[in-house]
Amino acid sequence: AVLDMDIRKCMPCGPRNKGHCFGPNICCGEELGCYFGTSETLRCQEENFLPTPCESGRKPCGNNEGSCAASGICCSNEGCMVDSSCDQEVMFP
């Protein structure tokens, strides 16, 4: 196991590199939303060849198995799901 290593940010991806890779076929960004298996995600496959782990997103979600990728979306390297804890603003009536 690799412990005490600096976890680096995953590669940037998407239009104008405004997103980050969340898995080999997932690219998400606050302003972009998420791309799945598109040309925007091709660069994310390069992560598979890098020796160090990476992390995207800031806030953990999905039972701490993923992190917030875009407004209302939680992603892990397996996929993404809707998660209200990732909403940009939680409105109170």
From Swiss-Prot:
Organism domain of life: Eukaryota
GO CC list: extracellular space; secretory granule
Pfam families hit by this protein: Hormone_5
Intrachain S-S bonds: 10-54, 13-27, 21-44, 28-34, 61-74, 68-86, 75-80
KW Zinc (keyword) present: no
SMART domains, sorted: NH (SM00003)
Database matches in InterPro entries: Neurhyp_horm, Neurhyp_horm_dom_sf
GO MF term set: neurohypophyseal hormone activity; V1A vasopressin receptor binding
Keywords: Disulfide bond
Tagged with keyword Membrane: no
Annotated family: Belongs to the vasopressin/oxytocin family.
Protein task: Neurophysin 1 specifically binds oxytocin.
Name of this protein: Neurophysin 1
Source organism per UniProt: Struthio camelus (Common ostrich)
Lineage: Eukaryota, Metazoa, Chordata, Craniata, Vertebrata
